[in-house]
Amino acid sequence: MQRQMKRDRREALILGAAGIAAATAGFLLGPVLLKSTGSGAMGEGTATGSAAMRAANLVDLSGRPRRLSEWLDRILVCNFWATWCAPCREEIPLLMAARQKYAPRGVEIVGIAIDNGSKVLEFTLSFNISYPILLAEADGLDLMRQLGNVSGGLPYTVVADRQGTLVHRKLGAFKGTDLDSILGPLAQG
């Protein structure tokens, strides 16, 4: 019996260490892997991501089914985030300001929460988030990967033009005028 307990404990320690190693590798290598797949401005090879955006089925905070294709006639900024993610929380005011500035010029910002619905609802009410929030929970990780986020890190943002073509992606929080440098030229065209 003691031998079985020792073996179970050893297996648990090995699995725990492997999980920590995998998470650390994803955190450290994620930006490198993302950069090698074209982080930032995008060129060829974005059709798969565009199709994934059009096909994405999510729900809003009231439980109503929503599709990202509802906004594909606009410049669409999809921001993947979670309530527990500090950089996600820090960039929310920038996203709200960008929506207020660029909405009249055909830009929509949609937050896609990789989190529990009740926590997201409470958070959005307390922060007075002014853009649409959709729930993806764990399914959002697969959508993020289809859109180029191989590490699964948050926050992660993709931008699609009015034709639904992915034109930009970013792993990590926006700072200062980052959004203006992306949305300004797109909103002029």
Language-model segments: which ranges?
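Short loop/turn microsegments at loop-to-beta-strand junctions
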Residues: M53-R54, L76, L154-P155
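Short, ordered coil/turn segments that flank beta-strands lining enzyme active or ligand-binding pockets
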Residues: L61, W71, R162
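Thiol/disulfide oxidoreductase modules built on the thioredoxin-like
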Residues: S126-I129, A138-G184
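Short acidic-hydrophobic, aromatic-tinged amphipathic segments that line or gate anion-handling sites
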Residues: L134-A136
